[in-house]
From Swiss-Prot:
Reported tissue expression: Predominantly expressed in thymus. Weakly expressed in pancreas, peripheral blood leukocytes, placenta, small intestine and stomach. Barely detectable in liver, spleen, lung and lymph node.
Pfam families attached to this UniProt entry: Branch
A GO term from the CC aspect: Golgi membrane
Record keywords: Disulfide bond, Glycoprotein, Glycosyltransferase, Golgi apparatus, Membrane, Signal-anchor, Transferase, Transmembrane, Transmembrane helix
Pathway this chain belongs to: Protein modification; protein glycosylation
Glycosylation-annotated residues: N72, N286
Statement: the UniProt record of this protein carries the keyword Membrane: yes
Protein's recorded name: Beta-1,3-galactosyl-O-glycosyl-glycoprotein beta-1,6-N-acetylglucosaminyltransferase 4
Length: 453
């Protein structure tokens, strides 16, 4: 019996030791990031040149050149089966993009970073210089996606406000601060919110940026708000041309509320932690809300807008707007009715009459979102994947996205389809170059015709 107890004791000790050793080895392997040192063959590096360079934190040092999968973006645009097939093959691989600490590393030296990304080669026209645009970027994750978005919309004559969620990871915050330090026309919002989904804090984040942008010395004409999974569909030259056509009007979705959305602002909502979730959500109570102040008629739409500076100045100096904001604090997703309603308030700059027809998300060029229940009716099927009924676009949609006519689109994710983002950025740079060089070439031809005649 004594021998059995002794044997049992030693066996238990051995099991504990083996368990401890296994956990220690797993932690060590994770710390060393073995996947980067000895990657498997079926991977795809989204940023091959950077991921194998000394400019990032998590460097792939033993990657064979065969991992570098070349795709022709012109072929993707023309929907050539071979190139579309390549993009589908890449999606079957383990897609590895730069992590937040990689963005921190590559933006730690601003001169090197700007050279790596070719900011000095960005072309700008006289028309763009005289028509600066402001941006409000409300972000919380995936620093590399935000970095790509900023690179795509960057123009030295524009102004950019970044609002990052106070709850965001520290590494993400450092990456955003680094980006802002590298440019005189990019800054972090002076007041940062802890943003909760469908809560007033999301609207407040944009308002914080708008307030800061009004204090800027850059006299911007319009402001556009975006999130980290958005991407432009127009070059800056084309966007300036489109904004000029507005002639002081605003561009956003504004429709009469369907019955399914009435509860959002007719009942009091309280922010509560949802069971089995790691988030807080505004939960409807049985307490009815009073009618909106000043006989304001509610319209609904999107959280995203294109607003004139005159409109933005007005809302910060108008008591009706302030009262309406206070009334909206306990509603569900107030950012989806706040702007859509204000644009209908009589006397506001760029006003749309209450009796005017609805402006749907398809009519407003602000932002293209493909909902799965409208696919096949209003737009072709999604070739990527879906998240909460919203399409994350695939490479086969490149041509449609550019030709559709919207100015921005959502959602993009490099882990779903990195080729689409790469090719869209390439196409926008090509369009910017073509639009800027075209006038000079046309002028040259006109002069030649005049000389020969």
């Amino acid at each position: 019996m004594k021998i059995f107890k002794c044997y049992f004791k030693h066996t238990l000790q051995q099991k504990v030791f083996i368990l401890f050793l296994t956990l220690w080895l797993l932690s060590l392997l994770k710390l060393l990031n073995v996947r980067r040192l000895f990657p498997q063959k079926d991977i795809y590096l989204v940023e091959y040149s950077l991921s194998t360079s000394p400019f990032v934190r998590n460097r792939y040092t033993h990657v064979k050149d065969e991992v570098r999968y070349e795709v022709n973006c012109s072929g993707i645009y023309e929907q050539e089966p071979l190139e579309i097939g390549k993009s589908l093959e890449i999606r079957r691989r383990d897609i590895i993009d730069l992590e937040d600490d990689d963005v921190v590393a590559m933006t730690s030296d601003c001169d090197i970073y700007q050279t790596l990304r070719g900011y000095a080669q960005k072309l700008v026209s006289k028309e763009e210089k005289s028509f600066p645009i402001a941006y409000s970027l409300v972000v919380h994750k995936d620093a590399i996606m935000v970095e790509r978005l900023i690179h795509a919309i960057y123009n030295q004559h524009n102004i950019y406000c970044i609002h990052y969620d106070r709850k965001a990871p520290d590494t993400f915050k450092v990456a955003m601060n680094n980006l802002a330090k590298c440019f005189s026309n990019i800054f972090i919002a002076s007041k940062l919110e802890a943003v909760e989904y469908a809560h007033i804090s999301r609207l407040q984040a944009d308002l914080n940026c708008l307030s800061d942008l009004l204090k800027s010395s850059i006299q911007w004409k319009y402001v556009i708000n975006l999130c980290g999974q958005d991407f432009p569909l127009k070059s800056n030259f084309e966007l300036v041309s489109e904004l000029k056509k507005l002639n002081g009007a605003n561009m956003l979705e504004t429709v009469k509320p369907p019955n399914s959305k009435l509860e959002r602002f007719t009942y009091h909502h309280e922010l509560r932690r949802v069971p089995y979730e790691y988030v807080k959500l505004p939960i409807r109570t049985n307490i009815s809300k009073e009618a909106p102040p000043h006989n304001i008629q509610i319209f609904v739409g999107s959280a995203y807008f294109v607003l004139s500076q005159a409109f933005v100045k007005y809302i910060f100096n108008n008591s009706i707007v302030q009262d309406f904001f206070a009334w909206s604090k306990d509603t569900y997703s107030p950012d989806e009715h706040f702007w859509a309603t204000l644009i209908r308030v009589p006397g506001i700059p760029g006003e749309i009459s209450r009796s005017a027809q609805d402006v749907s998300d398809l009519q407003s060029k602000t932002r293209l979102v493909k909902w799965n229940y409208y696919e096949g009716f209003f737009y072709p099927s999604c070739t990527g994947s879906h998240l909460r009924s919203v399409c994350i676009y695939g490479a086969a949609e490149l041509r449609w996205l550019i030709k559709d006519g919207h100015w921005f689109a959502n959602k993009f994710d490099s882990k779903v389809d990195p080729i689409l983002i790469k090719c869209l950025a390439e196409k926008l740079e090509e369009q910017q170059r073509d639009w800027i060089t075209l006038p000079s070439e046309k002028l040259f031809m006109d002069r030649n015709l005049t000389t020969t005649s």
